Amino acid sequence: MANLKRIRDRIKAVKNTRKITEAMRLVAAARVRRAQEQVMATRPFADRLAQVFYRLQTRLRLEDVDLPLLKQRPIETVGLLVVAGDRGLCGAYNANVIKRTEERVRELQETGQQVRLYLVGRKAVQYFQRRSAPIAKTYVNLSQIPTAAEAAQIGDELLSAFLSEKVDKVELIYTRFVSLISSRPVVQSLLPLDPTRLAARDDEIFNLLVRGGEFTVERSKIVAAVSAPPPDMIFEQDPVQILDALLPLYLNNQLLRALQEAAASELAARMTAMSNASDNATELIRTLGLAYNKARQAAITQEILEVVAGAEAL
């Protein structure tokens, strides 16, 4: 009987755990949807910004533009902006970002370059603090869905470090959102900006859908409307001055998109992890149920044998 009670208690505990993991899966799905809506909300601004940059490039194509954010200089120190998460229970999401960061740090150090780390997310901060890494700045407890203000704060500090020559180059390491079951850490160069890549084409957005009772994601191409700038776009000021003022805005927009992609990747990883945990809990409950039934049948059989043996003794 003690064995039966132990199995019943374990089944109850696993069922309670399954309720938690299923709730976390649904919460993550809702937040992925919110992240998707935020990406869509920022698209008109990003498209218009691309149009302005394209027109400015057209005007300045034959000029030698000398702007601080476009200036290439010998690279002695590289700043790495690493975007991880504040929480766990999201599979290998944080571990993959940290692993890619360590690989990139080794690559840079092998070429004789120094590294300064700008860390987003408590998991990355804790990991690199334990290893006495060269941490320049940390950002923790950001919003579940990144905001433009948070991206601007990070962007301003990176700009300050670059313009003051504390770093000669800034790279971004974040997890690119591919699908609910697939994501990959990527390394992207942020500073100095490349004027040939300002008007980005073939951008992508993701759409969270429900098919057959399961969540799925579709990615679709967004071609920025930069090939035909509006004819009424007239620059009253010097185009160089306008470009100089808009470059920080462009950088902040790139950071916001990266933070949004990383947040969506983390939420998708958490959805997948919690879905797998729920499935494993269901299978464990089934296995424990079979074990409980076998133990109960064995107990009943034993009781019958004892009754029969007692009757024969009389």
From Swiss-Prot:
What membrane topology is given? Peripheral membrane protein
The organism's superkingdom is given as Bacteria
Supply the alphabetized keyword list: ATP synthesis, CF(1), Hydrogen ion transport, Ion transport, Membrane, Thylakoid, Transport
Listed under subunit, the entry gives:
F-type ATPases have 2 components, CF(1) - the catalytic core - and CF(0) - the membrane proton channel. CF(1) has five subunits: alpha(3), beta(3), gamma(1), delta(1), epsilon(1). CF(0) has three main subunits: a, b and c.
**The family this protein is said to belong to:** Belongs to the ATPase gamma chain family.
Name used for this protein in its record: ATP synthase gamma chain
Name the InterPro entries for this protein.
ATP_synth_F1_ATPase_gsu, ATP_synth_F1_gsu, ATP_synth_F1_gsu_CS
Which HAMAP family has this protein been placed in?
Answer: ATP_synth_gamma_bact (MF_00815)
Q: What Gene Ontology cellular-component terms does the record carry?
A: plasma membrane-derived thylakoid membrane; proton-transporting ATP synthase complex
Location relative to the cell: Cellular thylakoid membrane
Q: List the molecular function annotations (GO) for this entry.
A: ATP binding; proton-transporting ATP synthase activity, rotational mechanism
Record's function text: Produces ATP from ADP in the presence of a proton gradient across the membrane. The gamma chain is believed to be important in regulating ATPase activity and the flow of protons through the CF(0) complex.
Return the Gene3D superfamilies for the record.
3.40.1380.10, ATP synthase, gamma subunit, helix hairpin domain (1.10.287.80)
Per the UniProt record, the lineage of the source organism begins with:
Bacteria, Bacillati, Cyanobacteriota, Cyanophyceae, Synechococcales
